[in-house]
């Protein structure tokens, strides 16, 4: 099988040296992502496209899906590569592929050529289009608004019959811009803002301020791992967790109620800046949007920026909440965010919307900054690829099984669309469906006299959720890994 990768248009208008560098990086990214599907896969770069060839037909859909999620790709053409002899042979091959698809439809033919030929692209369009129109009685030509466009590409002596076109996410290849550190909370905003910087070519590392215990950290790890695995797995990234409870406690004790929100954000920026400096990261990323909460007015954002010299990027600054939630839904992070607790918003009862610099600095004068230095020095840094392995160690007390007894219940915790795509079909065991994002609120309603075997495709989510349920006091859970 063969795929033709078309570049994001902004790449094609770069200077020759920059364009070549971007294409080289994108080629490497594609190779890094796809090697997990087919080790014999070949990725070849050209001036205006990238070619992917693979032998394992069983991985066709997986490879196509992975390509649609790699930044830098505008669209993907799945093609059949054949030799041809003349225009009539081109028509015959097009007829064999498109006959059933064109029945009862309007169509046109569009041809792109590379190389020297005795015919023009328009000659092929007219010949093939006329032949299809004659041989498919219910098909009709429509050059302005066809229902189906027959795409053909001719490269020297090869004919590429385009079977399907799939849109990519566009943007720049990851690695073409410098690294950033995303302050991730697991909510709608931070997930979307992280994705937007990945799409713009940045390798996004994650910094999490833990205010809600192990369960909160598990949830945020799920979001970060999901974003990385889905859109950024071509690169290694860090997940840094900072226990911010001591800082919050100091703020609650020493800082005036109305200033708490801004002071907390300034402390987070200071801590994240230290982490960024430690790892050579150039900028911080937040999900802040203008006016969304009290700390996100222009006055307060300026004061938050002043807490550090590190550049702070806010890709969602002009987005409204409805639009952000829609983006989260499209990315697949909405379900995570809906069940993620919000701890920051309850710290102050009457927050100021127009903080005064002198007053903020006076309140911070009461703060013991050695606490901030300590929590930063104790920050836990892991390779995001190790989240699954680390979770396995954390859930060592949760048994992993490959078989079941008739009294067990297999709990499919995958998202509904995943369950529809690959439904479980097992005999001699009861199967229930309860998506992972509903476990926290609905697991307690199940019959607690039974043992539940949590299942997801890769075992990462099931282990994370098993740990979460254990912490909630449920001992009747195991992880099912066939």
From Swiss-Prot:
It catalyses: [ThiI sulfur-carrier protein]-S-sulfanyl-L-cysteine + a uridine in tRNA + 2 reduced [2Fe-2S]-[ferredoxin] + ATP + H(+) = [ThiI sulfur-carrier protein]-L-cysteine + a 4-thiouridine in tRNA + 2 oxidized [2Fe-2S]-[ferredoxin] + AMP + diphosphate; [ThiS sulfur-carrier protein]-C-terminal Gly-Gly-AMP + S-sulfanyl-L-cysteinyl-[cysteine desulfurase] + AH2 = [ThiS sulfur-carrier protein]-C-terminal-Gly-aminoethanethioate + L-cysteinyl-[cysteine desulfurase] + A + AMP + 2 H(+). The active site is at residue 456. One of its GO terms (cellular component) is cytosol. It comes from the Bacteria. Its main location: cytoplasm. It comes from Pectobacterium atrosepticum (strain SCRI 1043 / ATCC BAA-672) (Erwinia carotovora subsp. atroseptica). This is tRNA sulfurtransferase. Residues 61-165 form the THUMP domain. Residues 404-482 form the Rhodanese domain. Keywords: ATP-binding, Cytoplasm, Disulfide bond, Nucleotide-binding, Redox-active center, RNA-binding, Thiamine biosynthesis, Transferase, tRNA-binding. GO terms for molecular function: ATP binding; CCA tRNA nucleotidyltransferase activity; tRNA binding; tRNA-uracil-4 sulfurtransferase activity. One of its GO terms (biological process) is tRNA 4-thiouridine biosynthesis.
